[in-house]
Structure formats: structure tokens, C-alpha cells
């Protein structure tokens, strides 16, 4: 009735008034972004293992001898695509390698349901809300250097003179990334000035604890 006071129940407290992350927390709440995974999905992710021998026996192609590299923001935590480039005479062989998530996420599993419901990972100013648990997104499905990983690869043969696509092939593969480059480092490799490369590597390496030694 009109004389009864309205009642309610607090279901969630979003940050605090002095929290530096309050605005981001509000964005997460406003758009109903899911930040937690179900126990079943977490259990499925934790149970995933990399079986290189099994993958090769089932038809994955072994291309671990290729020089493969990733290019991502310097603060990226998951690396889901990689490249390889080989020049042979008048042809350029370009390889595009995408982390094979399907090798770990069976159709209609709890993980599959989480991924379909979320649709993508969400990158915010101070955090990443992953599409899959970190056991997959940051580990088994992340193409980090010196680690064997399952991938879906596209081999593209280009004519060197004009970049015309001459042939392509798509196949599951086992790769091992050789290098992780930032955008600045990759651009410095493309640019002719050698000091750009040196400056980029020094700038990007410092936050990760690189130590510069004086050889004099």
C-alpha cells in the first residue's frame, strides 16, 4: 500500500567512493560483463593438457622448425596469433598461425557455453575480461616463445614483385614461437634506421626487468 515503505536487498557493492577503478567497475556492471566463470568451466580448463604426440598422430602438421613470431602490445598477456615469413626466389611464403582453441574446447561443453555467451575478450583500461579461463587464454592457447602450441595455420604463397596471392593452404599445426615483438619493435625492424630498433628494444625491455650491462 501507499503507507508501506519500499524495501530491497543489496545484491552487489560496486567499488568504493575513493576507488580509482570505480568508473571501470561501473562500466562492467552497466554492460553486464561476466567476470567469473562457472566451476564446471574452470574444472574443464584445468583438466586441459597439451598432447603434442596425440595431435601429430591425429593429423596436425609439425612446423616447429619454422621461425614464428608474435606482434602484440607491449603489455599484452595473451598471444593468440603469430606469423612466419620465408622468401624463396620470386615467391614469399607467409604463414598465419592462430591458436587452436577448438582443440581444448569441445562443442557444447561448459567452456563452449561460456565462450559463446561472452563472444570475445574485453579489453578495458586497467584489466582484461577473458573469453576463456586464464588456464587457456594465458597459458595453453597463448603462443608464448619457446613453448609448443597447437594452431590453425594458413600458408599463403605470394608473388614477390606485386604481392599477388598464388596459392594458399589451411591446416592444423604444432608450432613453437621464437620471438615476441611489440608493435614498436616490429616497426623498427621494418624501418631502415638501425637506431630505431635499438631504442625500441631498450624501451620495451626495461619494464620486464632487462638489465643493461656496460662492457667497457
Which positions does each model-derived feature cover?
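Electropositive polyanion-binding surfaces
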Residues: 2, 12, 16-17, 24-26, ...
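Gly/Thr-rich phosphate-binding beta-strand-loop-beta motif of the actin/hexokinase/Hsp70
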Residues: 5
Amino acid at each position: 500500500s501507499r503507507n508501506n515503505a519500499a524495501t530491497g536487498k543489496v545484491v552487489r557493492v560496486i567499488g568504493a567512493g575513493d576507488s580509482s577503478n570505480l568508473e571501470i567497475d561501473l562500466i562492467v556492471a552497466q554492460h553486464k560483463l561476466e567476470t567469473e566463470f562457472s566451476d564446471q568451466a574452470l574444472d574443464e580448463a584445468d583438466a586441459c593438457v597439451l598432447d603434442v604426440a596425440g595431435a601429430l598422430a591425429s593429423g596436425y602438421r609439425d612446423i616447429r622448425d619454422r621461425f614464428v613470431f608474435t606482434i602484440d602490445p607491449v603489455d599484452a598477456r595473451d598471444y593468440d596469433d603469430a606469423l612466419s615469413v620465408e622468401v624463396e626466389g620470386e615467391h614469399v611464403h607467409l604463414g598465419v598461425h592462430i591458436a587452436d582453441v577448438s582443440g581444448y574446447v569441445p562443442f557444447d561443453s561448459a567452456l563452449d557455453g561460456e565462450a559463446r555467451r561472452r563472444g570475445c575478450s574485453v579489453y578495458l583500461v586497467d584489466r582484461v575480461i577473458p573469453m576463456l579461463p586464464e588456464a587457456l587464454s594465458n597459458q595453453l592457447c597463448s603462443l608464448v616463445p619457446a613453448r609448443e602450441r597447437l594452431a590453425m595455420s594458413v600458408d599463403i604463397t605470394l608473388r614477390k614483385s606485386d604481392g599477388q596471392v598464388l596459392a594458399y593452404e589451411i591446416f592444423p599445426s604444432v608450432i613453437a614461437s621464437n620471438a615476441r615483438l611489440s608493435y614498436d619493435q616490429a616497426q623498427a625492424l621494418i624501418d631502415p634506421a638501425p637506431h630505431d630498433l635499438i631504442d625500441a628494444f631498450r624501451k620495451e625491455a626495461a619494464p620486464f626487468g632487462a638489465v643493461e650491462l656496460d662492457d667497457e
